[in-house]
């Protein structure tokens, strides 16, 4: 049983304290007389700093976006890099897997701390989210969240290693992230989210490539050669004083492969696509903010620009009805973003416009420097048909089918688009049956066109037009 008698006596401690106090009182006058006051103050200050030492840790905050709205690519590199640093001490992790991915993607949860060792020093990463709860704005009769929750990562380390971290470790993280991205590159398709005024992405899984692309072989080689020159000429663009970007105009009737060519370019270059719907952009300032949010090595796509918004020509006077629309986006604002000073805010970018009616576009949109290459996507010719037959029916170019000569004769002119030919080839897996069906369709279509030409005085079928401008 516990008893107070078992407690040690306090008498020795009291005696020692009394003796120590007596010695201090005796020494104090001697120290005050022999030690100068400035030295006394220095010793007291040093003792206080020792007892109340300031933290020796520095924390760098890496936000997902910079204040001007541009995406912080250092944040993306940090996310990729620390995702490879999973350890057994982690308490919470976020995992995901898209249907096109084989492996599970691991992301750190909010507040999770990850340690890393670099050249013998320890650094710590921490994922954070800054929630903006009261940042709603009234915008053109609708409510939007001006700034969604801001994500950031914190990098902490001892202050004495600041120079090593800034000049060596962070470039190391960026280079490692680039290697990782190249190894597991998953293309993204970005679209504009009006609710948050920012880009949101999904995985781009379009199978179109230049190998399977049904288009004129000469035109295909020209496009690929132009892309290759663009990628390797970074120093050239810098030397001549031009932004490192390239513009392509794809025009032609529906079903001629304009969208497939965009996907083939993205797969060829491993570039993400930013699908810009001009009708959802309210004003020029929003367009600039969106372009600042795009990354380098990407494609800015504007499909059907002739009917997206009223950008046909600046020479037409504006009527009262033109000013009643909700969009105040102007042609001059668009031109400034794709070719003005704002176009220099980024490197290795491609701008692609598609249209069905090239003649409706303002000439200012079409000049070199904005649209450097005009690619006419026309009706199906015999070379395009052979590519489609190889893709859909497995027919070889070296062993042509007996119906090829008749198809070559019937397909001349503006008869069918590649999409219409592909639809006919998909109706049957037997090459004989599929090609016989295509021959019937071609004969019927030619009769319709010849009748139409006779009524309109066109004077027969026109030869397929191939326009290619550099």
From Swiss-Prot:
Cofactors, names only: Mg(2+)
- Enzyme nomenclature, EC number: 3.6.1.-
Highest taxon listed in the record's lineage: Eukaryota
Catalytic activity annotation: ATP + H2O = ADP + phosphate + H(+)
TM segment ranges: none
For this protein, the record's InterPro entries field holds:
AAA+_ATPase, AAA_N_dom, ATPase_AAA_core, Mitochondrial_chaperone_BCS1, P-loop_NTPase
Give the top-level enzyme category: hydrolase
Q: Which residues bind ATP?
A: 252-259
Molecular function GO labels? ATP binding; ATP hydrolysis activity
Give the signal peptide as a residue range, or say none if absent: 1-18
Assigned keywords, A-Z: ATP-binding, Hydrolase, Magnesium, Nucleotide-binding, Signal
Q: Name one Pfam family in it.
A: AAA
Q: Its Gene Ontology biological processes?
A: response to stress
Return the similarity comment. Answer: Belongs to the AAA ATPase family. BCS1 subfamily.
Q: What is this protein called?
A: AAA-ATPase At5g17730
């Amino acid at each position: 049983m516990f008893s107070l008698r078992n407690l040690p006596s306090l008498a020795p401690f009291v005696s020692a304290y009394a003796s120590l106090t007596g010695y201090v009182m005796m020494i104090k006058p001697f120290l005050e007389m022999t030690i100068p006051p400035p030295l006394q103050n220095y010793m007291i200050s040093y003792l206080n700093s020792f007892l109340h030492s300031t933290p020796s840790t520095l924390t760098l905050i890496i936000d997902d976006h910079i204040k001007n709205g541009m995406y912080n690519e250092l944040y993306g590199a940090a996310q990729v890099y620390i995702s490879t640093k999973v350890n057994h001490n982690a308490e919470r992790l976020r995992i995901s897997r898209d249907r096109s991915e084989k492996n599970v993607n691991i992301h750190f949860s909010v507040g999770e701390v990850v340690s890393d060792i670099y050249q013998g020093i320890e650094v710590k990463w921490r994922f954070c989210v800054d929630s903006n709860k009261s940042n709603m704005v009234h915008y053109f009769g609708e409510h939007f969240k001006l700034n969604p929750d801001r994500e950031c990562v914190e990098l902490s380390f001892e202050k004495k290693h600041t120079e090593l971290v800034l000049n060596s470790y962070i470039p190391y993280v960026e280079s490692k992230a680039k290697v990782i991205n190249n190894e597991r590159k998953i293309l993204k398709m970005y679209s504009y989210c009006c609710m948050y005024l920012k880009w949101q992405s999904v995985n781009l899984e379009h199978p179109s490539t230049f190998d399977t692309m049904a288009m004129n072989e000469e035109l295909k080689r020209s496009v690929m050669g132009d892309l290759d020159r663009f990628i390797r000429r970074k120093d050239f663009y810098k030397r001549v004083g031009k932004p490192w970007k390239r513009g392509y105009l794809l025009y032609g009737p529906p079903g001629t492969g304009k969208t497939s060519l965009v996907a083939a370019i993205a797969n060829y270059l491993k570039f993400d696509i930013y699908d810009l719907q001009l009708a959802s952009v309210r004003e020029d300032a929003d367009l600039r903010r969106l372009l600042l949010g795009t990354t380098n090595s990407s494609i800015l796509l504007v499909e059907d620009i002739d009917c997206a918004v009223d950008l046909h020509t600046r020479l037409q006077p504006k009527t009262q009805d033109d000013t009643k629309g909700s969009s105040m986006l102007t042609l001059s604002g668009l031109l400034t973003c794709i070719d003005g000073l704002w176009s220099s805010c980024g490197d290795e970018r491609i701008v692609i416009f598609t249209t069905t009616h090239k003649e409706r576009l303002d000439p200012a949109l079409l000049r070199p420097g904005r649209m450097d290459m005009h690619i006419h996507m026309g009706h199906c010719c015999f070379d395009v048909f052979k590519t489609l037959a190889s893709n859909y029916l497995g027919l070889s170019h070296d062993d042509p089918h007996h119906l090829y000569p008749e198809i070559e004769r019937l397909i001349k002119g503006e008869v069918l688009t590649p999409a219409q030919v592909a639809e006919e080839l998909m109706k049957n897996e037997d090459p004989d049956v599929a090609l016989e069906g295509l021959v019937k369709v071609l004969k019927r279509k030619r009769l319709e066109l010849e009748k139409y030409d006779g009524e309109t005085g066109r004077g027969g079928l026109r030869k397929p037009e191939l326009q290619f401008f550099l």
